[in-house]
Amino acid sequence: IYSHFGVADICYVCIGALIPIAVTGGFHIDGFMDTMDAFHSYKPREEKLAILKDSHIGAFAVIMLAAYGLLFMGAFSQIINDKAFIVFCAGFFISRCLSGIAVVSFKSAKSDGLLFMFADTAHRTIVRAALYIQLALCMAVLFIVSLPYAVAMIIAAALSFWYYYVKTKKELGGITGDTAGYFVCICECAMAVALGGVSFII
């Protein structure tokens, strides 16, 4: 579509990468940066949790955000097929469904904070079931749109979800509000890479 209107590739990539940030106000990016600072501090668990509360930006947050941006934009530049783009857009819904599932399923690293409050008061079974149903319906539609792209993206999302569980449990003993944003970012980037790879191959 973008090529039909004569939009340059670099413009397509930059605007495409900016839209999710503009829509959310960079809320998830903030969590990603805080989490990167904590993970790359290589300090004891308690100090990592303290770093998550620190409003200052560390060097590793900036470095990893730059790396993330380059990887995401590079992958997005390969998504030039209309069906791949449709599947890519659905990825934002999938990442948030999985993030919600994690909130009501994974252990919280702290006994305070917004995430703990939400998880503690939520009707876990009902919320989890609702999210799984929405996720299943979304995947069913994607299978109809394009089986190869849908399979690639779902595998990437599942691997991201598994990595998120293992990494946060090892580093922090559970998840926090910041790591929820971190997960959304890595999940969306992984899905973009998967779709970009499949687009390049086929």
Model-predicted regions and their roles:
Residues 1-33, 86-91, 149-170:
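Membrane-embedded alpha-helical segments that form the functional core of polytopic membrane enzymes
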Residues 87-102:
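Function-critical hydrophobic alpha-helical transmembrane segments in multi-pass membrane proteins
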Residues 3-4, 25, 38, 54, ...:
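Transmembrane helix-loop junction
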Residues 26-36, 98-109:
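Membrane-water interface of transmembrane alpha-helices
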Residues 108-115, 120-202:
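C-terminal membrane-associated helical module and adjoining short loops/tails
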